[in-house]
């Protein structure tokens, strides 16, 4: 029996394939509620605290929608500037206090490892909404859900492109897809390559890994293209960002060489790495992908609070 009640959601490495599949199954059952076609009171009387120390649109709003669709209430930090953090309060004390107010904490923080550290001081479950450039497990769960709904997971041929050095979404996704025997191609400028330790770990698991600097070389050989933006905020040197920001771009012309069934995903926000003329093609699934964050986060909230087993 899989136990999720009071469990923290910090890294994909904390979950087995069987547990991931179960979470995806629960999300699928909750999708009619996420779409407003059915009503639910699973989180009636529960308070979910959203502690976001970095900007967020989709993650934050989808957690709010997920909570409200399940009948719960949201306790949200308006801004870091308006909080006691600006007075010097440390994260540990903030977590201790918010644990007294809420039944679960969703934390986004710029420091690597901050979510794991928060669990040491929390009296309630903590869900990692993204910490530094390392982990973003709820994004990975929704990416897996999207791939399963739009294509398939087992033996998937996928390319991840863009900022593979700083992109926490691709780091988490690599591990998760390795559980399904995916074939992975990494496309990026040399400066933004996938970290070598991740590539080594994948190859130790006998996962087929290729690397390229050119989308044209690989576009006809893949089933899913996972595109990411170059993350300007992670660059210590702005000039280095300027050198690489426009190196990779998906256009309608490029897609003429793609498999007709190719699906394009993007964790959003995008900058200019996907041309607007791609949006109305059958390949573009990134807006539906953003919606899938709602049923996935509903499932994670319900399971960790313990209203679903």
Swiss-Prot record:
Keyword list, A-Z: Pyrimidine biosynthesis, Transferase
Superkingdom field: Archaea
Gene3D superfamilies: Aspartate/ornithine carbamoyltransferase
Metabolic or biological pathway: Pyrimidine metabolism; UMP biosynthesis via de novo pathway; (S)-dihydroorotate from bicarbonate: step 2/3
GO CC list: cytosol
Signal sequence interval, chain numbering: none
UniProt binding sites for L-aspartate: 87, 168, 229
GO BP annotations listed: 'de novo' pyrimidine nucleobase biosynthetic process; 'de novo' UMP biosynthetic process; amino acid metabolic process
E.C. no: 2.1.3.2
Catalytic activity from the UniProt record: carbamoyl phosphate + L-aspartate = N-carbamoyl-L-aspartate + phosphate + H(+)
A GO molecular function held by the record: amino acid binding
Subunit and partners: Heterooligomer of catalytic and regulatory chains.
Listed NCBIfam families: asp_carb_tr, PRK00856.1
Family to which the UniProt record says this protein belongs: Belongs to the aspartate/ornithine carbamoyltransferase superfamily. ATCase family.
PANTHER family xref list: ASPARTATE CARBAMOYLTRANSFERASE (PTHR45753:SF6), ORNITHINE CARBAMOYLTRANSFERASE, MITOCHONDRIAL (PTHR45753)
Function (record text): Catalyzes the condensation of carbamoyl phosphate and aspartate to form carbamoyl aspartate and inorganic phosphate, the committed step in the de novo pyrimidine nucleotide biosynthesis pathway.
Protein name as catalogued: Aspartate carbamoyltransferase catalytic subunit
Organism of provenance: Methanosarcina mazei (strain ATCC BAA-159 / DSM 3647 / Goe1 / Go1 / JCM 11833 / OCM 88)
